[in-house]
Design a protein with these regions (language model features):
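C-terminal motif of bacterial Sec signal peptides marking the signal peptidase cleavage site
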Residues: 20-24
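Short linear motifs in low-complexity, proline-biased tails and propeptides
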Residues: 11-13, 299-300
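Bacterial N-terminal signal peptides that target proteins for export
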Residues: 2-12
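Hydrophobic helical h-region of N-terminal Sec-dependent signal peptides
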Residues: 14-18
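Exported/periplasmic ABC-transporter solute-binding proteins
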Residues: 26-312
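N-terminal acidic, proline/glycine-rich, low-complexity intrinsically disordered segments
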Residues: 1-2, 27
């Protein structure tokens, strides 16, 4: 009997071992989204590839350049080209289909949206940061604060001498970004046309003696070397060669200086959104890039660049 039992037990044991081995193989053959070790690459994050262009705002360009550099370091098969000829050029490029992302320091107009629709472009807006637009003078200038009404008078040409504002007897050298700039448009709407705050006078325009400059960098440089100059620039462009003055919404309001803190608190009178525009909701590598810009890491870059991160 023992011989008979042994005769059947051995083959049965072999069958069970083989079945166990095959069962193990079957379990491992199903794809999973987790990794078996720290050195095995995950199957859930596909390799990002592709190239795209970002064109537009001179103000947003330094921020986009940092984001693009970081994103390309993390994704070696991605190429991003960033240029900053102005928000108007960026919006025109989006409408014409010559850029993938328009970076803008102003809101797109209804007229531009209509032009885009006529060309089959579905404008999609994403706010990526906030800016506190700063009014700067030379550090030697004794003026430390101005009202919106006074700023409007300076830029329309009603006030032409610093002594009219309690300063030195010297002609004010008034400088602005050029008409392609979103900052030019925003400052006109938020300051120049707000002489009788809160009423907006759309007939008011920049005075004919205002010097129009092609870049923010040039304006800051001019103010640094000219004690009688005034200019406006994004918060990220401030440095110790110029002085940002406090802005009073009205004569009875306190003067508020531009900073991340005052912009986040909503107390600084000249704050604005910084925007990306795409043709339809972003997808693929462009969506991955914008998701990075909006991530905690991307918003830390906003702060490091001197702009205001989005509230979470």
């Amino acid at each position: 009997l023992n011989k008979s039992v042994n005769k059947w037990l051995l083959p049965l044991a072999l069958i069970m071992v083989i079945a166990f081995i095959f069962a193990g193989c079957s379990t491992n053959s199903t794809p999973t989204t987790t990794t078996s070790s720290a050195t095995t690459p995950t199957t859930t994050t596909p390799l990002l590839t592709g190239s795209f262009k970002i064109i537009g705002s001179n103000t947003v360009t330094p921020l986009s350049a940092v984001w693009a550099e970081d994103f390309m370091k993390a994704n070696s098969k991605v190429s991003i080209a960033v240029s900053g000829p102005g928000s108007g050029v960026g919006i025109a490029s989006l409408i014409d289909g010559t850029t993938d992302i328009c970076q803008s320091s102003r809101l797109i107009t209804q007229s531009e949206i209509d032009q885009a629709k006529a060309k089959g472009v579905n404008v999609y807006q994403i706010q990526v940061a906030t800016d506190a637009l700063s009014v700067v003078v030379n550090p030697a200038n004794p003026i430390s604060e101005l009202t919106i009404t006074q700023l409007s008078a300076i830029y329309t040409g009603k006030i032409t001498n610093w002594k009219e504002l309690g300063g030195k007897d010297a002609t004010i050298v008034v400088m602005s970004r050029d008409t392609n700039s979103g900052t030019y448009t925003y400052f006109k709407e938020a300051v120049v046309q707000m002489a009788e705050l809160p009423t907006k006078d759309t007939k008011l325009e920049y005075g004919n003696k205002v010097l129009m400059l092609p870049s923010t960098e040039e304006g800051v440089s001019q103010v640094a070397s000219n004690p009688n100059a005034i200019f406006y620039a994004g918060l990220g462009y401030l440095n110790n060669t110029v002085k940002a003055i406090g802005i009073k919404k009205t004569a009875n309001d306190p003067a508020i200086k531009p900073s991340v803190e005052t912009a986040l608190a909503g107390t600084y009178p000249i704050s604005r959104p910084l925007l990306y525009y795409t043709n339809g909701a972003p997808t693929g590598v462009i969506k991955a890039y914008i998701d990075f810009c909006l991530s905690a890491t991307g918003q830390q870059e906003v702060l490091a660049a001197g702009f205001v991160p989005l509230k979470k």
